[in-house]
Amino acid sequence: MPSLYGLERSGDVEKLVELLQESEKETVRRRAAEILGNLDEPEPEGIQALVDAMSDDDESVRAAAIDALTQQEAVDALMRGLDQEVPDSGATWAQAEAFVENLESETPELRMAAANVLGLLGVEDTARPLAKQLQTEEHVGVRARVARALGRIEQPAVTGILVDCLHGEPLKVRREAAESLGRLTTEQALDGLLSVVEDDSEAMRRTAVSSLGRFETAEPVDALVERLGDESDLVRRAAVFSLIEILSNVPPDQSHELRETIVDRMSARSDPSIIKSLIEIIDEGTQLHQRRNATWMLGRVAGDQRTKMDAIEALRELLGEDDDLIAQFAATGLAEIGGASVETSLLEVVETQEYGEDAVAMAAFALGKVGGDRSRQRLERLVDETDSEEVRRRAFSAISKLGGKT
């Protein structure tokens, strides 16, 4: 049987369903349910397996199945698993009223499901009954899901109640409250999150740090920079992600000063996890502005020899990027790092057949900033060999900077 990690990557619904139904380990069944909830296409048999798992002997598996069905927005299936019917009315507010009533159910699973669906529906008027439920609910699993729902409804009026949940509550409730505060992004929410960035729990610090990245202001930057020195690699990486996110969202008049502050502090850390996180954002990020900022930063915080080669390799692979700014930032980043390693890496782009004309042109540009005699000689040959006007233009310009004949 493949590992759960492998199944998560492959999205093998059949194998996940088999684990959910037949594994003797509740941790495996729970994780299988979570993975099914995250799939783009869980298929009908995956949904049905989650419905069946709502009757699992283990409470954590039942809760995971409820969350997974909510993640898939499979409200009909969710209610079927609880022997309930979805309200016939097509109006969202009418459905919401019915689920608010379910918050009073004696069955914890139904209260969990009700909270989840209310978060999914996002009806503002349900924030008040959810907040009331959070203050009176005794079941930890239900409390956690109510806190989550309040964040998804995004009503600032509930900020104070969520801040109160950051302290003196079970960890799962505290983390859901922290994540919800990141959605609200009020001043009170910010103050609350800043109060737990040094929490004893690694998981709590990581959640708080991640939530701070949602604020479109420079205020969390100092706290996030401090977390670059956290003892936990996961917290440090979350801090990098949040700093990039803030940098991508702050007003332009604050951007330059912030960049310099963040670069100075990241460079001082010389931490491999920072480089790894930046490369991950570049490789896997879905937002262009995040990838641009991470590329720009990578060349300026490359650090010592332990991390420098990873940064050089990542930037080299971006020289032919379709986005002109990313390609430009990659070239200037390599120039910022400088040295023989960068020159050798750039010459490989010019000398092999693995790279397209755009990458070769940007490599020639960068060689004009970091190259020596061997680069000048290779660029002079490139001028004669290439059929690309852009490559020739970049090579000519680089040769002139290196003191060669043009």
From Swiss-Prot:
Q: What's one GO MF term for it? A: oxidoreductase activity
| Record-given protein name | HEAT repeat-containing taxis protein OE_2401F
Q: Which SUPFAM superfamilies match?
A: ARM repeat (SSF48371)
**One matching Pfam family:** HEAT_2
NADP recorded as keyword? no
Q: Which InterPro entries match?
A: ARM-like, ARM-type_fold, Armadillo, PBS_lyase_HEAT
Which residue spans adopt a coiled-coil conformation according to this UniProt entry? none
What role does it play? Involved in taxis signal transduction. Essential for the ability to control the direction of flagellar rotation. May have a role between CheY and the flagellum.
For the null mutant, the annotation states:
Mutants are unable to switch the direction of flagellar rotation. Flagella rotate only clockwise, resulting in exclusively forward swimming cells that are unable to respond to tactic signals.
User: Which ranges does the record mark as transmembrane?
Assistant: none
Summary of subunit composition and partner proteins: Interacts with chemotaxis (Che) proteins.
Extent of the HEAT repeats? 7-41, 42-78, 90-127, 153-184, 185-215, 216-252, 370-406
The source's domain of life comes to: Archaea
Instruction: Name the species this protein comes from.
Output: Halobacterium salinarum (strain ATCC 29341 / DSM 671 / R1)
Which PANTHER family does the record match to this protein?
A: DEOXYHYPUSINE HYDROXYLASE, PBS LYASE HEAT-LIKE PROTEIN
Sorted alphabetically, the keyword list is: Chemotaxis, Repeat
- Gene3D superfamilies associated with the record: Leucine-rich Repeat Variant (1.25.10.10)
Q: What GO biological process term is on the record, naming one? A: chemotaxis
